[in-house]
Regions:
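Alpha/beta-hydrolase superfamily serine-hydrolase fold, recognizing
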Residues: 1-171
Length: 171
């Protein structure tokens, strides 16, 4: 299982997610790989996507796994990275992973979807306080990892909610 950690692309690490991924390894009986991908604001998009694809391909080319033996996933920004990695692999006509497992994926970093409401913020103990602060300050969290000049909200490799997942593995 290739698991991309969350942290808004600006924090988090394999170590910060040790407890979670250890639990996932225990209940699944499989090895869980957690790459230490580059973070913002020092490393801007597409550094994270490049690292996501490179790590997946390394499991195949360097470690001898078949794509059918690999599931990818992640939480929050790691869920975003799993989705954009999947879409990039599809674009490259690469062999896709067997499945994708997501925990509260950051599929719409712009926060422009209908599900981002004040009501949701009151119910979501993880993201609620963050979203309220973002709305209050009219801020965009994705600026931690995407340069303003590069933002393209229609690009599914940045904002995967609108991606084409036809012929992709189960998500």
């Amino acid at each position: 299982f290739l698991y991309y950690h969350g942290g808004g692309y600006s924090m988090g690490s394999p170590e910060s997610h040790y407890s979670l991924v250890s639990y996932l390894a225990d209940i699944s009986g499989t090895t869980v790989y957690v790459p230490d991908y580059r973070l913002g604001p020092e490393n801007k998009y597409p550094a994270q996507l490049d690292d996501g694809v490179k790590t997946y391909m390394s499991l195949i080319n360097d470690f001898g796994y078949s794509h059918n033996q690999i599931a990818i996933g992640g939480d929050s920004a790691g869920g975003n990275l799993a989705l954009i990695t999947l879409l990039k692999l599809k674009e490259l006509n690469a062999n896709l992973p067997s499945s994708v497992a997501l925990l509260s994926p950051w599929a719409d970093p712009s926060g422009s979807g209908e599900s981002y409401t004040e009501d949701m913020a009151d119910r979501d103990i993880l993201l609620g306080p963050i979203m309220k602060n973002v709305w209050k300050n009219d801020d965009e969290l994705y600026h931690f990892y995407i340069d303003e000049k590069d933002v393209d909200k229609k690009n599914a490799l940045m904002f995967p909610l609108g991606g084409d997942y036809k012929n992709c593995p189960p998500i």
